[in-house]
A protein has these predicted regions:
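TRNA-recognition modules of translation machinery and tRNA-sensing kinases, especially anticodon-binding
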Residues: 2-303
Length: 303
């Protein structure tokens, strides 16, 4: 049997057993073995948390006004998910519900709420830190995690619409933010080696919207603002981004009025880990039987 056949069979087995398919593409149930590995990854990432790092955990929704102010709506409207609800009188809502049996479309009665689905874990961090006042030039560090949503419906393994994102965020002087990002780039290569997965670390860009977005993506690569750690999950030709390392310059500093203690606009950076993608990459690399994984990998994950 060829390597390609083994790979295809393994991917199909992950999709049907380690993950459980649902009626929606990119929305899967997670099994006990999957969650065991997620737990190990979470602990491994936590072991690298710097002393003094603040820990924040968020639900999968956030303020719509906050997201609009952050610039996400302008840059990524095609990925956004909004929370809507039925509004009106009891009679009007009942009519919509009962009309469903007659083939009427009840979603016409939906109205947007003040909530959206969180697209990135770090978005809720910046206004919280800004509200506290100036930050030291040496930086404020935050460990943040959230379930996130991006409207990327796909049958491709690892391309989930709802997923868990863990991030370390740095807010401080420009040189502090850059040094933080560079440190995590190097550390991520060590982590990937420790996990026994093949990888490449490359300059990257975000999927900005529209024609103007293509120019933004080019500028992002040219300025080396974003790097991704890629692991070949579905294929060598189109590896999956499982970690990213981003330098936002003064974008969030200007947006939220973040200042360092010398009065300058704060710069920000983050190291982001796609926990579900990393877990899928581990099963794709080492097989479905966790007990048969290399001892060094099991030791790293404490499983």
């Amino acid at each position: 049997m060829s390597t390609a056949q083994v790979s295809t069979e393994r991917l199909e087995a992950i999709t049907s057993s380690i993950l459980q398919p649902t009626a929606a593409n990119g929305v899967q149930g997670r099994t006990a073995p999957f969650e065991e590995v997620i737990g190990g990854l979470t602990a491994l990432i936590t072991s690298h948390r710097a002393p003094g790092t603040e820990v924040l955990r968020f639900p999968p929704v956030m303020s719509r006004a906050l997201l609009e102010k952050s610039g996400y709506l302008k840059s990524f409207p095609h990925l956004l998910g909004c929370v809507s609800s039925l509004t009106g009188t009891e009679a009007s809502i009942r009519a919509l519900v009962e009309g469903r049996a007659a083939g009427q479309d009840w979603v016409d009665g939906l109205a947007a709420t003040d909530l959206v689905l969180t697209p990135a874990a770090c978005y809720q961090v910046y206004p919280i830190i800004a509200a506290r006042g100036d930050v030291p030039r040496s930086g404020v560090l935050v460990d943040v995690e959230s379930y996130c949503f991006r409207r990327e419906a796909s049958s491709e393994l690892g391309r989930m619409q709802a997923f868990r994102m863990r991030e370390y965020v740095c807010i401080g002087a420009p040189d502090t933010a850059v040094a933080f990002r560079e440190k995590w780039k190097a550390r991520a290569e060590q982590l990937a080696t420790q996990l026994g997965v093949p990888f490449t670390l490359v300059p990257a860009s975000d999927p900005f919207f529209g024609r103007a977005g293509k120019l933004m993506a080019v500028n992002q690569v040219e300025q080396a603002l974003k790097f991704e750690l890629l692991i070949p999950v579905n294929s060598e030709e189109a590896p999956t981004a499982c970690m990213s390392f981003n330098y936002h310059q003064d974008h969030f500093g200007n947006t939220w009025g973040l200042r360092t203690d010398d009065g300058a606009v704060a710069h920000t950076a983050c190291a982001a880990f796609g926990l579900d993608r990393l877990t899928i990459a581990l099963f794709a690399t080492h097989g479905l039987d966790v007990d048969a994984w290399p001892p060094s990998v099991r030791e790293a994950l404490c499983i």
